[in-house]
């Protein structure tokens, strides 16, 4: 009887642990949001607003930008530090890269978590941006982007040059809250 009680106790403990893990997973990615207001840096006129919404394993990113070079592409990244105080936004640090991967194409699995698709501006230097990515979370955890910064670069990211895609100066920066 004692052996059977022990087996039942172990089984119930395992079920309880699995339930806790399942509940934690369900809490994550169920609509948590963060946003950033980007201000001009490096003498540019660029600015924007970005919203991050966690949906399951993915994060939906929506943004609006102005003051960009007309009919062009700009690199766009989440950076490791939540600090945009430097005039050239170098205070934001490098690309957010919690898994120490090489720089690369977004969603390839072989990229920094902070590597985002380029922004494409219209003839007036405005852009509307939408992307759905994975590899990071909308929280303050080790893979979380809350408390970090998001940066627009002057030039397009080539997704191959190391360590940062050869995307030029940082022209706008905002803290992700």
Where are these regions (language model features)?
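Bacterial N-terminal signal peptides that target proteins for export
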Residues: 2-12
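N-terminal leader/targeting pre-sequences
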Residues: 2, 16-73, 78-177
């Amino acid at each position: 009887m004692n052996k059977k009680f022990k087996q039942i106790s172990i089984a119930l403990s395992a079920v309880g642990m699995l339930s806790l893990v399942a509940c934690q997973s369900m809490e994550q990615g169920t609509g948590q949001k963060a946003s950033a207001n980007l201000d001009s840096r490096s003498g540019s006129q660029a600015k924007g607003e970005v919203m991050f919404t966690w949906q399951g394993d993915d994060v939906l990113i929506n943004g609006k930008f102005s003051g960009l070079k007309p009919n062009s592409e700009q690199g766009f990244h989440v950076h490791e530090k939540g600090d945009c105080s430097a005039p050239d936004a170098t205070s934001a640090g490098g690309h957010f890269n919690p898994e120490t991967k090489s720089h690369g194409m977004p969603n390839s699995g072989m990229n920094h978590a902070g590597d985002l698709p380029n922004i494409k501006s219209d003839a007036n230097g405005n852009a509307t941006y939408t992307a759905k990515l994975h590899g990071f979370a909308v929280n303050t955890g080790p893979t979380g982007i809350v408390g970090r910064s998001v940066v627009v670069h002057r030039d397009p990211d080539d997704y191959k040059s190391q360590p940062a895609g050869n995307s030029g100066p940082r022209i706008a920066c905002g803290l992700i809250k």
